[in-house]
Amino acid sequence: MPMSGRVRIPDGISSELASAAGCALRTVVHGFDRLGRLTDLETVVIQGAGPLGLFSLAAAIRAGAGRTILIGAPAKRLDVARRWGADHVLNIDEARDPQRRLERILDLTDGLGPDVVIEVSGGATAFPEGLDMIRRGGRYLVIGQVSGESVSMKPSVFTQKHIQVIGVLLGAVEHYYKALAFLSANRERFAFDEMLTNRYRLDQINLALTAMQRFDEVKPVVIPEVG
């Protein structure tokens, strides 16, 4: 509906998925709009395995990335990433040392590093880690940094490696429209419902938040009703 700030949910898309698209996928779509074209010669590393990370994986695959690597935890989320088509996953619960993760990524990219890194973990220390792993001339899409926490880094890395850094927060109604269209066009390619985990009543919302903090949930669904 032009000029209204409202979009129509496509047939076959549940209210739960449409809600997820209104935040996580809308942000990813905005980020990919700003990131630009991907080619089948490029490797994309995604830092984070939550809704932003899984949507970024799907978007990178559909955008034509040659290879995708997802870093995150817990194992159940990485299993979803594998089923969706990630070429490699790296479990941070099994590789807690950043240097070990860097070495693994370099091994997978012939020592060059990835062409594109997408930060969606929300962890401040992920940012300098991404800068370390990205190849010369690479692009770094930063979506997850909202905490305001400070980290140590060397600004010279931007000039020495010719890195382009792109920051994105949320998106406009046009990105929500594109997000819903993405769900509709790719619902048979990716089992998006795998992200929607347990359902909670409104009076159980604190239970849902606690479960998310424990990483027991990917995207819990809160139903606007009470017991």
Where are each of the predicted segments found?
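NAD(P)H dinucleotide-binding glycine-rich loop of Rossmann-like/cofactor-binding domains
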Residues: 1-47, 97, 190
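C-terminal substrate-binding/catalytic core of Rossmann-like NAD(P)-dependent dehydrogenases/reductases
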Residues: 98-106, 146-197, 207, 216
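Residues at the starts of beta-strands that form the adenosine-phosphate
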Residues: 43, 66-68, 139, 164
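Glycine-rich Rossmann-fold phosphate-binding loop(s) that bind the pyrophosphate
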Residues: 24, 48-51, 73, 145
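Hydrophobic/small residue at the entry helix of a nucleotide-binding pocket
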Residues: 27, 52, 60
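Adenosine-nucleotide cofactor-binding segment
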Residues: 46-49, 61-129
